[in-house]
Amino acid sequence: MTAPERVGAGPGFAPGALTVHHHPDELAKVTRALRATGRRITLVPTMGALHEGHLELIRRARRDSNSVVVVSIFVNPLQFGPGEDFTSYPRTFETDVEACRAEGVELVFAPDRDDVYGPDPQITVHPGPLGDELEGASRPGHFAGVLTIVAKLLGIVRPDLALFGEKDYQQLVLIRRMARELNIDTAIQGIPIVRAPDGLALSSRNVYLSEEERGAALALSAALAAGAHAGREGAEAVLRAAREVLATEPLVRLDYLELRDTELGAAPAEGEARLLVAAKVGETRLIDNALVLLGDQGDSRP
């Protein structure tokens, strides 16, 4: 994999302007110098193909006027399995850089694969048992790849805060766990899912959907809403309501629909839970999730 074309790259850091860095040592030197002046660093990790969900992360990051926002753009090969879409994953680097510029981002980190991993990487971060459940059951090795690149980014950038979208909820839980258990001194914050007006969770992979498939994909968010609405009646009612919605859409091939607690253990009898769904619509694999309030606390809807 070759490095993205160097767009607007320049040495160091220019306040109020965008600087693109490609080598880890370059960026680490800049963020170290910024911290020495009392500036905070906030990291927004992405694989590019930026959409409104990513831009919301950036806007949240920029709310802290003392923080310099670093957006990383790197399509991480370690988190793609055989037969997945690493080669075809959307790459829109120049457009992404311009989107970052428009949002007031001052640092973009767009490294080459070899600069991140070296010629013969041997070490990965093991996600533990949760890494083999839900997404991990369908995508073996995926979360080892995710945690490894996130650990590397946190080590290179040394941010005070890193923001992740809640759409990849299992990923968020595992990253928080990694930071806690490995004593990584970065606060990990989840940002609520950004949805299209019709309810579809925004994803870079939505571009793969045909018009018909996109309509069918709305069954995922509709199922979550139905499940959340049934929360007062308990866990079985939540799952039953969601399954009934999914069963009405023949183009949706369900992978899993599960109700867990907020740390992705067994669902509680009452209180906050998370309803998670994954399905293929056509050839595109989509995931979504929603908070559910079980028992007398009422219902919650995506």
UniProtKB/Swiss-Prot annotation:
Residues annotated as transmembrane: none
UniProt-recorded Gene Ontology molecular function terms: ATP binding; pantoate-beta-alanine ligase activity
Binding locations of beta-alanine: Q79
Pathway: Cofactor biosynthesis; (R)-pantothenate biosynthesis; (R)-pantothenate from (R)-pantoate and beta-alanine: step 1/1
GO terms for biological process, alphabetical: pantothenate biosynthetic process
Keyword presence, Metal-binding: no
Cystine residue pairs: none
Enzyme class name: ligase
Catalyzed reaction equations: (R)-pantoate + beta-alanine + ATP = (R)-pantothenate + AMP + diphosphate + H(+)
EC number(s) from the headed UniProt entry: 6.3.2.1
Cellular localisation: Cytoplasm
Note: The reaction proceeds by a bi uni uni bi ping pong mechanism.
Reported function: Catalyzes the condensation of pantoate with beta-alanine in an ATP-dependent reaction via a pantoyl-adenylate intermediate.
Family: Belongs to the pantothenate synthetase family.
UniProt name for this protein: Pantothenate synthetase
Species: Saccharopolyspora erythraea (strain ATCC 11635 / DSM 40517 / JCM 4748 / NBRC 13426 / NCIMB 8594 / NRRL 2338)
Underlying gene: panC
